[in-house]
Amino acid sequence: MAINNAQAAIRNAFIELYKTRSIDKITIEMICKKSYLSRSTFYKNYRNIDAVAAELENEVRQEMIRINNDYNYQNIFDIDSNCPSPNFVEMFRCVLRYKDFLTGAFSDHGNPSFYFRSKVLTSEFLKSHILSHYTTVKHIDLICDICSDYIINSCKMIIKYENDLSPKGLAIEVKKQVVDFVTNEELYLMGDENKDES
């Protein structure tokens, strides 16, 4: 998405303010002061503060959808956790790229609907690709729900603690945890539909 200099300044100002306060506590005056722009310049580019937030949320969401759609069907739950799929790595690269915005979006004062939509998107991604590799999946909805929570919470921790791992390193660490959960808990993936589920 192409943005002009004024939009970039407005977005950057919003992101900085969003780190410490909720969207409803951010005013146009604050944005203008931090970006050194006039109110008229703000209104030439955005209808209101919510429009700035929505643009950034949609940008992140569309990038995640693109990454998911480009998935090459390498199994994310392969036991060899040292070889995460390229798109799993790309997901964490995206998280790091939008780290400043996600600091606010995934915080306690962030937009709950953005967190929920991110979780649904991640869960749907996991479900579609698990089913492409396993004939029978026991408790798949619960598995995907828990794993998507874990992945998003891992993203939050990465952002909060300024994790210095590379995108691949982050993907490896998170994948190990997900694989451990899937293979060691009662909620597990079954590769053979004829196996006894008792």
Language model: regions and residue ranges:
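Amphipathic alpha-helical packing segments from all-alpha helical-bundle domains
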Residues: H109-Y134, L142-D149
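Hydrophobic alpha-helical connector segments
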Residues: N69-D100
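Hydrophobic alpha-helical segments that form the core
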Residues: K138-Y161, K168-F181
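Residues in the helix-turn-helix
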Residues: A9, T41-Y43, F101
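Helix-turn-helix
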Residues: T20-A51
